[in-house]
Amino acid sequence: MFMYPEFARKALSKLISKKLNIEKVSSKHQLVLLDYGLHGLLPKSLYLEAINSDILNVRFFPPEIINVTDIVKALQNSCRVDEYLKAVSLYHKNSLMVSGPNVVKLMIEYNLLTHSDLEWLINENVVKATYLLKINAYMINFKIDLTVDEIIDLVKDIPVGATLHLYNILNNIDLDIVLRISDEYNIPPVHDILSKLTDEEMCIKLVTKYPMDNVINFINQDVRYSPTFIKTIKDFVNKHLPTMYDGLNDYLHSVIIDEDLIEEYKIKSVAMFNLEYKTDVDTLTLDEQIFVEVNISYYDFRYRQFADEFRDYIMIKERRQITMQSGDRIRRFRRPMSLRSTIIKKDTDSLEDILAHIDNARKNSKVSIEDVERIISSFRLNPCVVRRTMLSDIDIKTKIMVLKIVKDWKSCALTLSAIKGIMVTDTINTVLSKILHHHRNVFKYLTSVENKEIAVCNCSRCLSLFYRELKSVRCDLRTDDGLLDRLYDLTRYALHGKINQNLIGQRCWGPLTEMLFNENKKKKLNNLMEYIKISDMLVYGHSIEKTLIPITDSLSFKLSVDTMSVLNDQYAKIVIFFNTIIEYIIATIYYRLTVLNNYTNVKHFVSKVLHTVMEACGVLFSYIKVNDKIEHELEEMVDKGTVPSYLYHLSINVISIILDDINGTR
């Protein structure tokens, strides 16, 4: 099976024959080239057709001809702004900045605005400062004025760290506001304005309320040296030992002489105040032993010989080992992270790097087609190879050489590979080619049925079912029947264009997003499934629909990938659709094994899961054989988090059958 359908290969041949000038091919071929991303930069004459095909095509036009509204739509449908979309966005930056608060929010998330841009927006009253601060307070690094009501309203909606940053940029910050925010929202008053507070009792209250936040550093100097204040803080520190507050210890060290601290705290003074104190481990009191063990990381750093001796002492005396303890004991406020970004992590061996290598080799010596084909073969499953090749800076002759190879790529449908010792037909290449061929047909079908109630739907697939009501209305999720009934309903909803991308508390973790979009899922499967016990896996019956979204609303930009690796929005949504069905399969099996701890008749249950999914999709007379070795693989999946390759293979077989059935090619 060819990677591209015949009409797409024919259109690409015409483009190659015209020296890659898309304006010189027929309008029929132009539309095909646009639909399959078989193009580079685009001419003005194809603007409407390209935008209608996929809004992200806006980035491939000269910036001066682009409509600002189209740029906005492109930004809304992206995860990352690549160099092309960034260029057209910056060209129209002034127009975008006055296109409304939501557009400004997008531009901030994509890092398209400078600090001076934000200052201009506030000074010109285009957007309110509070709006920008709620998006990302750290972007504002210049002084602003806010009313008390605005400050209080803002504090309700931003993290603690952002509030502390806000204190530093306000012109009109005063002590009353800081204290009010502390009382009402429990945000530490760590600001120089606190030094104006001379009420010793209030200062003590604040320091002891926030012992980890170094409020002590902002206390009035007269209060800090008050004997009563010193004694109260020391009593507070002593009361909470062996827990240590580094900031308070530093304060005590600054107001009490070393000799007095050593006399009172002895070996504890090493960890608390970084003082030198020598002693034998066998002379320690029980209280001191507990303190040293809890704070062993301090001794590892400040008095390693003693720490080693203490470990040996405990091993001999109590026959137990004190492990190394390390970590950052300083509390840090984490800045909010956006799903959107302008940063794209570059692969070490990207397609662009390889193309440049081929181009240089061509110029210096003769390069055979066989060599080029071998070098780029690792990108066989990438549907965007043609577009990325045409957008590259290599010579046109090299581009044509590569495109001729890509045009004739075939999926390896008959290749045999060993998975867990089982010889199986490798269908992954065929499935990927099928999705590339038919994604628009599948998308058209799913959008045609997404508004139908599945219990009363009269579509051709529902009419063929033996059971058309919701199966899981009354089900026991502790049983196989309950799990299968819920899976049946989930899959029926999916076939009617409604999916749950977040079934286990993780999004897009299945094999298709990983293989098609080069997603790097470093987490083991058992780590991905860590919240399965409290996830939407517990939802069944009529409540299922509340957890679903239409396939048309499944945001393809949620895939954390370079947009250059996504063919178009419809393609990404169909990949998400089939990937979600595989996730349903894997999650159902994993839930039975781990949550229910049921390992009986695993092979039989896996077979039931696969056939339940096909039945829910209206595929009633297909059979998939499951090998006995599935049981060992699933044990490894649960115990070690290893990827269940054979189960993935079986699941891909299932979606291949479903895809053929939807497309009418089965």
From Swiss-Prot:
Bilayer disposition of the protein = Single-pass membrane protein
- Which conditions up-regulate this protein? Expressed in the early phase of the viral replicative cycle.
Q: Which residues form a coiled coil?
A: none
Family in the record: Belongs to the orthopoxvirus OPG074 family.
KW Membrane (keyword) present: yes
TM segments? 574-596
Q: Where would you find this protein in the cell?
A: Membrane
Q: Name one GO cellular component term.
A: membrane
In terms of InterPro entries, this protein maps to: Poxvirus_E2/O1, Poxvirus_O1
Q: What is its main location?
A: membrane
What Pfam families does this protein map onto?
Answer: Pox_E2-like (PF04497)
Its name, as the record gives it, is Protein OPG074
Q: Which UniProt keywords apply?
A: Early protein, Membrane, Transmembrane, Transmembrane helix
